[in-house]
Each structure stands twice: as C-alpha cells, then as structure tokens.
Amino acid sequence: MINYPEPNRTYKHYKGGLYKVLFLSKHTETSEILVNYQSILFGSYYSRPLESWNEPSPGGENRFTLIEY
C-alpha cells in the first residue's frame, strides 16, 4: 500500500527534524511522484521521491511520522 503524505501537515523525521509537506508533484522525465517539503526550523525546501519518503529508516522505524496537534 502506498502512503501519500498530506499537504500542509507536519511530519517528524526519524533524526528529529520537523517538516511541513507542501505538495506532491510528478518528475517530468520519469513520472515519479515527489514529496516537496520544508524544514520548520531552517525554512529550507526539499524534494524526495515518494518511495524514499515511505522507506523505513536504517533502524527500521518510519522515516517520517505524522505529528498530530
């Protein structure tokens, strides 16, 4: 099952950083779905393939976990 992160929601990375998902997009050449997100602390922007977003961390836990407020 594919887990699609929700835009405008905050996720915690397994290393501790907090990130806001901005939107999902599609790579123009490969059609791969990308997760576009922003660091809450630094304001930096990132894009990561959805497959990578959903991969477990090296320790086996979720790479990103939805933070419920």
Task: Report residues per predicted region.
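Short connector loops at helix/strand junctions that flank enzyme active sites
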Residues: Y14-G16, E32
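Short coil-to-beta transition motif at edge beta-strands of beta-rich domains
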Residues: I2-Y14
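Basic/aromatic-rich interaction segments and small domains that mediate binding to polyanionic partners
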Residues: S25-L50
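Residue-identity detector for threonine
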Residues: T10, T28-T30, T65
